[in-house]
Amino acid sequence: MNEILNKQDDKALWEYENFVKTHINGNFMQSLCWTGVKRTWEWEAIVSRDDTGKIKGTALILIKKIPFLGCSFLYSPHGPVCDYTDVKTLRDIFEGIEKLKELHNGYELRVDPCITENDTKEINIMKSLGFEFQENAPELTTIQARNNYILRINNRSKEEIFESFHKKWRYNIRLSLRKGVECRVCGPECLDDFYKLMEETGKRDGFCIRSKEYFELMLKNLGEHCRLYMCYHDNEPLSGAITTQYAGKTCYVYGASTAKSRNVMPNYLMQWNMICWAVENGCSIYDFQGIPFYKDENHPNYGVYRFKQGFNGEVLTYA
């Protein structure tokens, strides 16, 4: 049976959050903390329980009102959270979401669950429930990146993981340390430094960036699940990243760097420090996130893939 989460019930909120953060398919964007970041959206959540009252699945739904049209767009980022082979639970969750669509006059529901393109059983189940699989969607047309680069930790030690990197990547990490680059875990006091790097990166690489307030909200609302990493050389900021750790996964969500002093290799050291955070807390995956156009060696973004590839992970393509 499904229910709309009661936002006034502290026990229900705790129970929801505990389910999501301990589930293998949990994701920080399905956390209630994420609603404090997406402040321009309304939100609801659906909870599906078995006959004993145990939670079997959940879905956080972001709701965007469309001005002047009186309708809404509903989106569940990397949701729902459940066993994707459990048809009964999936159907129950989506029946609950249909109630939300009626309440908010929804014209479209979009979900991007953590199902890979090779999970044909799960894909067919989603199709049977009325969803369309955008198999050939062009790069950058989906809300979340379809092609990610991940490093599976697999209970390995830091030493074992380090030795698995390409030898040039190991050299660059050691070089960065020898050159005196310092990678720090920072608080909001370093956001100005990070945002200047982000502005430079966006201008250099030709993409729009989030507001500084957005990054402030991430650090504030995700709390212990979010870190700001900064690399400094002689107290000059060279690179920075906002990284999350939730449900057994550490995700490199936003990164920025200056074109100056690249010879001291700050980005290599920063990634290594974030991977160490994942290992220290028993994560199963370190997610480098998107690698758009990674199959096209002539595309300007190909260098993003080449950099991440040196850490000896694998490409994961979501459905």
Range-by-range predicted roles:
Residues 74-76, 109, 286:
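Hydrophobic faces of well-ordered beta-strands that scaffold small-molecule active sites
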Residues 80-134:
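A gly/proline- and charged-residue-enriched helix-loop-helix capping module
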Residues 77-87, 154-156, 255-264, 292:
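A short, internal acetyl-CoA/4′-phosphopantetheine-binding micro-motif in the GNAT/acyltransferase core
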